[in-house]
Every structure is written in C-alpha cells, then in structure tokens.
C-alpha cells in the first residue's frame, strides 16, 4: 500500500458499518481499534413489546411475540398503503381470508382458525370486536403505525375473550425528539388512489400526532365477467392524538373518525344504474381513547385506560338491508410494579357491547347488550440469567354467559447465548356472536339471533413451543425459528338450518382442533436478505365422529422473500408465496397456486419513489375456478380462496419534511 491517508470502511455481520481514517504506513505497526455499534440484527432483539402488558424487550419475554416494524413495515406499506391486509397476510401462520366476492371484505385467520377467534387491538384498546370487526382490516392504513405485534395461540388471559387464535396489537407512532412530517401518494392500475399525511412533534410538556387519509378505488373487473373484483369505494380518515408529559403523570387523548361508501357487484349497475346484483356498505366509525399513567414510586405505576367506539354500518343488497349500530366501551385500571427480577401487573376492567338494529327487517331483531367484568394478575420472573417465567390468571364474568377462569403460563430458556426456547399455553373463550365469516357471506339475511338460553361460550385450550437459533456463518448472518402449536376448541358455534328457511348459530357437541408448525429462516449477506417461511396447518372438525378439514385453510404454505438494500438509497424486493389446495365449504377442493411480487424504492434525503408489481403472474381464481353459480343478476357466491383482482401495479411518492 502506498503511503498516504486512507478512508477505510469496516463492517461485520450484525454491526453497523463504520468509516475510519487511517494513515499508512503506521509508524509503530500498531493495531487500530474500531468501536462498532450493534446493527439491525441485534436491534430486533431490543424491540420493546407492549402487547404482553409487561413492557420488556423481545429478548426478555417468555411469551412468543412476532413484531413487524422498521423497514419491513415500510416495505409492506409501499405495497398496500390503503390497508393492512398484505402486512398481515405475508407472515407465516397468518392468512387474510376474503369473505365477500364483491365487497372485498376480509378477515384474519391465525393457524387455521376463523377471524372471530383473533383479537385486534389498537395500542392495547379492543376497538375492533363484534360488528365493528367487519371491514376493520380494510380501513386501517399503515402509515401511522410504529410496529405490529402478533401473539399466536391462547391470549385471552391478557385482554379477555376473543383471543383464542391469538391477538394483533397495532402500535401507533408517538411524538419523538425530532419532528416528523410525511406524505404519501399512491396510484394503482386497478383504479385505486391513496393519499395520506402524518405529523408528529413533541414540545416541552406536550406532544401531538395527526394522521389523515383519503382512499378510493374505481370498480375493477379484470376477468371481464361483469362483477367487481375490487368494489367502488371512497374512504376518509382523521386521527388526532394529544400527549401531555408531567413530572410523575403522563396522559394521552385521541379520537378517530372513518367514513366510507363501498359498492360492489354488477359493473353495469355501478356504472350505468342498470338492473343487477349489488352489495352496498355504508360505514361510519368513531373511536376515542384516553390513557393516564401516574408514577407512584420509582418502581410502581398506576394506569387508567378508556375507549369508546361507535360503529354504524348499513349493508344493502337488492332484496335485503341490514342496518345496525354498535356502541362499545372499555375501561381499565392497572397497578404495575417493575422489580429487579420480577414484574407485576394487577388490574380490573369492564367491557360493554351494545348492538341495536335500525329500521324494519323481516328477520327477528338481533339486538343484544353484553357486559364483561374482569380481574387479572400477571407476573414475569427472571429466575436466573437463563430462565424467565411468566404466569397470569384472569377471571371474566359475562352477564349473559357466566364466569370464565383463564390461567396462562410461559417460560423461556436461554440454552446458550445463540439458542433460546420458549414454551407456553393457556385457556381461552369466545362469547357467542352472529358476526362470523359465514354470516358475513349471506349479509346476515334470514339469520336468527343468538339464543342465550341455549348457547354458551366457546372454550379453548392451547399451547406452543418454539426454538430460536441465531449465529454468524462467516460473513452470513443466520437465524432459524421453529414453532409447534396446538389449539383445541370445544363446542364451537356452527351455522345450521332453522324452520322457515332461516339459519341460526348453535354450539356443536364436539370440537375442532388445529395443530402444526411454522419454520422461519433468515439469511443476511452484505446488502442481501433472504427470508424463507413454511407453515403446516392441520385444522379439522371432529363432529359426529367424523374428521374433516376445516374449510379455507391451506395445509401447506411457503413464503419466500429476497431483499436487496443499499441503506438510505435503494430497496429491491422479490417475493413468491405458495398456497396448497384448500377444502371449500361445499365439500370440494380449490386448486393450489403461487403469488409473486416485485417492488423497488429509490430514496433521497427527503423523498422517495416506489413501484410494486403485485401478483405479476396474474394468479386469479376466475382463471381456474368459478366464484359464483346461478345468473349474473342473482348470483350464489362460492368461497373465495385465491386472489380475484389479479396482477396490479401500484406506485407513488413519499415525502419526509
């Protein structure tokens, strides 16, 4: 090396790249020490999780929690800026199931169980339960999210009934040290337009966040069959949130308003007003959240949380209208103590859920009012540097369905610095409801209300065990996670025939179960990252001594994602997902299929442009199967198990000020 001054770039897997200046030759041939900071690989273990109620990093939580944050959250937001379907669907063990061929409505399935068994939270508030869960994942935009936390398996001990399959906690951005102003504009080849903006700033004793968006789509029929694959819709969202910071007390107050008009069905009806089948959804959603935390001592905190939700939805088809208003509330007091080795939380909460049908209907009114009163205690105990134990117990009393006792336990063992294993399990329950995927498909027509005298809570027991290994193989970062899971659901609610051509829900006398495994492999080399995931889901009903596949659950699923990233300059991503055949509700089987995608983003200091080629192989159910029987004006829709929108290109610009 010729004498002179050189700039040397030092890098190592798992550590941040660093540039240093050296002089050659070194006069005393001494070694130059370089202090490097932990990079992204380690930062993942340092993410603080809130869904477990006891705020610890992922590395110190016995409960298995998956977190979608940072670059991954941003990349998924580029692909689908208008909602969180893709964000969730591309994780192992999670499938977003389309429940309506024309309205595009979808629910979340975790490990094969229907969407009603998954609890969706916003910053720990249960804002999307019952009737308000309809269209929920289609109306949540990802731009103002900091991270998404997913717990798979029984989690009712944490937040009450409904979390039999698991829970999804959507964690919002909060004001940081630096002001954040961002805007996004996105257009799609399917006639979609997404416009959104986010503002965040912290002042001395106060902070503010503000999110606003407009999302719309023209009716889209790529199969040219005369029915919408993507409906015509227009949605507006506004979400202000105020934060107050005192010496010992902090508070935040927020509100959200979402209004949407959505019309799917006959293209001739939507465009020209001609006769034909249609499904209209008019929704207005108002939610408020209040949180107060007071520091009692150096280690103890008292918290109060309250939320209110008003959800008004009108569903109209040519022969029927379902018009209902749901009002629900959540109030909770908790005492938290963080110790040197053990963390405690003790709390009580009250949930109310009130539904009233509005207008005239030929069906009996499905009105109800449920009140749930809960007490819970939870402890996380670091027994040693290698063993952490988490235990919890909840008691819930539901006014119409009685008392539920919900124990839960999880343990984490650090076998070596690179090898960790977690094992856990618990009980769960779900209050009977008419708001299921099956009822959504028939727009709640000819459906009797829940008979509270003959119905009881659906009860579950489940557990999981995972092994996580991380190391460096030369210049290659390597991590492998393998999960085994099992859930048994006793007396599930099923839809059966009733007199007069009606249908009703009743508890089955038997059970259903789901078991399987998930494998996630991650490799990093330089600017490349490879993610490979495999899910085996063996979900079955066991009714009348007969074992059958649970409908609309892919037994085998493969996720492949290859990313190339030059930090703060360029991102490229290639994806391929495989779904094996699925049993349909009519007893037939759908065909297996692949979905592929490619995205690119070019970044500058204050803005970036992105483009995404989603499903560029144009996989569509209408290519290899039908989505309805009967006539175009009076269709009887079949299960939707594959994409119906086909190949869609979207692209846009993001501005950061």
Outline where the language-model segments fall:
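Short, acidic, small-residue-rich periplasmic hinge/interaction motif at the N-terminus
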Residues: 9-16, 25-75, 115, 295
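Extracytoplasmic beta-strand/coil segments of soluble accessory domains associated
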Residues: 76, 85-129, 146
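Short acidic/polar hinge/loop motifs at secondary-structure boundaries
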Residues: 107, 125-152, 451-452
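Short strand-turn segments of transmembrane beta-barrel domains in outer membranes
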Residues: 155-157, 167, 172-201, 228-231
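Flexible loop and strand-edge segments within Gram-negative outer membrane beta-barrel domains
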Residues: 217-236, 245-303, 308-328
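Outer-membrane beta-barrel signature, preferentially recognizing the C-terminal barrel domain
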Residues: 270-272, 276-295, 418-420, 424-488, ...
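Gram-negative outer-membrane beta-barrel transporters
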Residues: 382-384, 479-489, 507-584, 654-656
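C-terminal beta-signal and adjacent terminal beta-strands/loops
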Residues: 488-490, 495, 600-657
């Amino acid at each position: 090396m010729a004498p002179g001054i050189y700039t040397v770039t030092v890098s190592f897997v798992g550590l941040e790249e660093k540039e240093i200046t050296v002089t050659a030759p070194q006069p005393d041939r001494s070694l130059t020490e370089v202090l490097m900071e932990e990079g992204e690989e380690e930062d993942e273990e340092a993410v603080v999780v809130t869904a477990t109620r006891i705020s610890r990093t992922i590395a110190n939580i016995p409960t298995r929690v998956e977190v979608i944050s940072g670059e991954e959250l941003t990349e998924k937001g580029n692909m689908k800026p208008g909602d969180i379907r893709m964000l969730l669907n591309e994780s192992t063990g999670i499938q977003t199931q389309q429940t309506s061929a024309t309205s595009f409505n979808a629910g979340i399935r975790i490990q094969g169980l229907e969407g009603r068994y998954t609890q969706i939270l916003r910053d720990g508030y249960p804002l999307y339960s019952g009737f308000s869960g309809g269209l929920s994942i289609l109306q949540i935009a990802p731009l103002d999210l900091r991270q998404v936390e997913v717990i798979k398996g029984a989690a009712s001990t944490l937040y009450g009934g409904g979390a039999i399959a698991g829970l999804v906690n959507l964690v919002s951005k909060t004001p940081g040290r630096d002001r954040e102003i961002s805007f996004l504009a996105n257009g799609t080849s399917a006639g979609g337009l997404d416009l959104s903006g986010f503002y965040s700033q912290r002042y001395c004793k106060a902070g503010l966040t503000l999110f606003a968006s407009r999302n719309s789509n023209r009716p889209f029929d790529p199969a040219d069959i005369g029915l919408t694959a993507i409906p015509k819709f227009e949605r507006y969202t506004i979400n202000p949130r105020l934060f107050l910071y005192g010496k010992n007390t902090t508070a935040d107050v927020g509100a959200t308003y979402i209004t949407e008009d959505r019309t799917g069905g006959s293209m001739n009806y939507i465009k020209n007003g001609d006769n034909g089948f249609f499904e209209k959804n008019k929704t207005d959603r108002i939610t408020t959240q209040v949180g107060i935390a007071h520091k009692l001592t150096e280690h103890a905190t008292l918290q109060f949380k309250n939320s209110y939700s008003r959800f008004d939805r009108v569903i109209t088809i040519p022969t029927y209208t379902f018009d209902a208003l749901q009002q629900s509330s959540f109030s909770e007091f908790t005492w938290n103590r963080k110790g040197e080795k053990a963390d405690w939380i003790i709390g009580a909460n009250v949930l109310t859920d009130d539904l009233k049908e509005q207008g005239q209907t030929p069906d009996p009114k499905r009105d109800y009012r449920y009140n749930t009163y809960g007490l819970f205690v939870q402890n996380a105990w670091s027994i040693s540097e290698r063993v952490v134990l988490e235990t919890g117990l909840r008691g819930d009393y539901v006014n119409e369905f009685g008392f539920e006792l919900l124990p839960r336990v999880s343990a984490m063992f650090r076998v070596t610095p690179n090898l960790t294993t977690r094992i856990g399990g618990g009980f769960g329950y779900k209050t009977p409801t008419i708001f299921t995927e099956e009822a959504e498909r028939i727009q709640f027509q000819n459906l009797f209300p829940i008979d509270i005298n003959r119905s009881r809570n659906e009860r579950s027991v489940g557990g999981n065990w995972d092994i996580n290994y991380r190391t460096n193989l030369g210049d290659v970062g390597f991590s492998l996670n393998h999960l085994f899971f099992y859930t048994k659901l006793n007396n599930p609610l099923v839809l059966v025939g009733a007199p007069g051509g009606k249908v009703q829900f009743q508890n089955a006398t038997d059970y259903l179960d789901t078991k399987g495994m998930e494998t996630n492999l991650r490799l990093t080399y330089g600017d490349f990252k490879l993610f490979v995931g495999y899910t085996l889901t063996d979900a079955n009903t066991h009714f009348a001594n007969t074992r059958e596949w649970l409908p609309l659950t892919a037994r085998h699923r493969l996720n492949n994602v290859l990313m190339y990233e030059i930090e703060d300059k360029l991102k490229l991503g290639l994806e391929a997902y495989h779904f094996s055949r699925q049993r349909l509700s009519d007893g037939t089987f759908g065909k297996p299929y692949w979905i592929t995608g490619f995205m690119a983003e070019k970044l500058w200091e204050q803005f970036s442009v992105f483009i995404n080629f989603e499903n560029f192989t144009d996989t569509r159910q209408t290519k290899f199967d039908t989505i309805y029987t009967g006539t175009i004006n009076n269709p009887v829709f079949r299960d939707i198990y594959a994409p119906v929108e086909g190949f869609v290109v979207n692209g846009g610009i993001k501005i950061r000020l």
